[in-house]
Each structure stands twice: as structure tokens, then as C-alpha cells.
């Protein structure tokens, strides 16, 4: 990597710093994906995509000037696979955020899957873009979460008005 003695005169110093950051912190961010949810998860995917794309580009550039081609090829393949996965997850995150922005100002910081009730916004766990709403006398639950005064249901940034058997507008008001 080099020392600090020739840092100012080295034209590739910025590349080396970014590469050191990518190699050091990308595995930590990948591990943090297991314990993250919501907006933090989306931002982690964006950072991992940027780190993996830089690492992939650097490894393919160095590949042609190195004698350790097998190791660089395997590293580039792993960086490419993680980059593609993080790109798809980042795209899902960005599209759900844009959909929430289109719903209005108060939904900008809302979770992608939530229930709007008389008490405010409640985050719900949804698998994909599906939720199970149960309406009984005096009780409304969405995916096992009790909701007082259900007004609307938002899944993946889209308002679920008439999906499935339940007409949420009818039960909500």
C-alpha cells in the first residue's frame, strides 16, 4: 500500500485510500445486513454496491498488471456478485422511497410497509408485497399487529386500497 512519506506526491493515493476502505469495511457492512432493517438496510446496500463496484473496477485494472491472476479473478467475481445483489436491493429501496414521496410529504420518512391508523403510522412486517388483514367486530389486525382505527395500508410504497378479499376503504372509515 505504501507509507505516509510519499503520500502527497503519489498520484494514486486517493485510490489506495478508497481501496483500503472498501476492503476493510465492506465485509463489516455485509455482516451488518443481518441486523439492519428499513432505511438503514437500504443505505447499507447502496454503500456496499459503491464499494463493490470500485473494488471490482480496481481488481480488473490490476488484473492485467499482476502475476496473481487467479486470486484477483476470484476476488473480482465475488465483488461482482455482491455488487449485482446490492444493486437490485438498492433499486428496490430507491423505488419504494420514490413511491412514498409520491404519496405525500408525511410519507417521506415512513417505513415502506406500514399501516395508517387513528394513532399514526405503524410499521408492519410484510413478506414481499403481501399482508393479511383480519377484520372482526372491535378488532382489526394486519399481519398479527393490532391496529386501532385502520385508515390505509401501504405495501412497498404503494397504497393497498382494494387488494385481495378485503376492501380496506370500507373497513377503514
Swiss-Prot record:
Keywords (A to Z) from UniProt: Disulfide bond, Host membrane, Membrane, Transmembrane, Transmembrane helix, Viral envelope protein, Virion
Topology feature Virion surface, residues: 1-12, 61-69
Membrane topology: Multi-pass membrane protein
GO (cellular component) term, any one: membrane
Residues on Intravirion side: 34-39, 91-173
InterPro entries found in the cross-reference section: Arteri_GP5
Subcellular location: Virion membrane; Host membrane
Membrane-spanning parts: 13-33, 40-60, 70-90
Disulfide bond as UniProt keyword: yes
Summary of subunit composition and partner proteins: Heterodimer with glycoprotein 5; disulfide-linked. This heterodimerization is required for transport to the Golgi complex.
Homology family: Belongs to the arteriviridae membrane protein family.
Function: Major envelope protein.
Protein name per the record: Membrane protein
